[in-house]
Regions:
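Domain-level signature for proteins that mediate thiol-based redox and metal-cofactor handling
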Residues: 1-195
Length: 195
């Protein structure tokens, strides 16, 4: 696909001014995860420490700027670098990412499926996750209407898999096969420092 024709737009990441999700069809199909190496010009921004972390999904790329950079100054350059680099060879992706799965899941819940969640008169929260599994809390919906809870869980899982195909399973608190694992869900940041 000609990069000039590829639609792309930025989406702010709540509570993280250094992060932007660039909504763009990446063409990666089943390849998602942390970008370790990228072709230029995107790769040059990583090597030059303009970009500190990039996570690739099928419908976007999440980008964190290194401290000392801002989107007002770097946004256009990052956008152009994404467009010029996506169709080039040389991408090396670190297979799966618990951080990316959580980001995609929260974005699906609060964005793509926000109307369905609101219509179900419930809240949805990602309680735990690893790189291939999610535990969801669907609020009081399961006790009020287990069938509606199962349907909402399935819709969430399907929407996430479109963007993160490595998702293998979801469970819900109070639902069938629910369990509670103790996992660290603190997102890590690959931020460079001069220390």
């Amino acid at each position: 696909m000609n990069h000039a024709m590829r639609p792309i737009h930025p989406q702010a990441v709540p509570d993280d001014p250094l992060a932007v999700r660039w909504v763009v069809h990446t063409g990666t199909q089943g390849v998602v995860g942390e970008v370790v190496v990228a072709p230029d010009p995107f790769g040059a921004l990583m090597r030059d420490r303009v970009i500190s972390l990039a996570l690739l999904e099928t419908e976007g790329i999440w980008v964190w700027l290194a401290p000392g950079n801002n989107w007002a100054d770097r946004g256009h350059k990052v956008r152009q670098a994404i467009l010029e680099s996506l169709d080039r060879d040389g991408w090396h992706i670190n297979g799966d990412s618990a951080d990316l799965l959580r980001l995609v899941a929260n974005d699906v819940i609060s964005g793509d499926l926000a109307d369905e969640v609101h219509a179900a008169d419930t809240t949805v929260e990602v309680v735990e996750n690893d790189a291939q599994w999610l535990l969801l809390d669907l609020g009081q919906l399961d006790s009020r209407d287990p069938a509606a809870s199962a349907e909402l869980q399935q819709r969430i899982e399907t929407a996430i898999r479109v963007r993160y195909p490595l998702l293998q399973d979801t469970a819900r608190l109070g639902g069938p096969q629910s369990s509670h694992f103790t996992l660290s869900n603190t997102p890590r940041r690959a931020l460079w420092t001069d220390d």
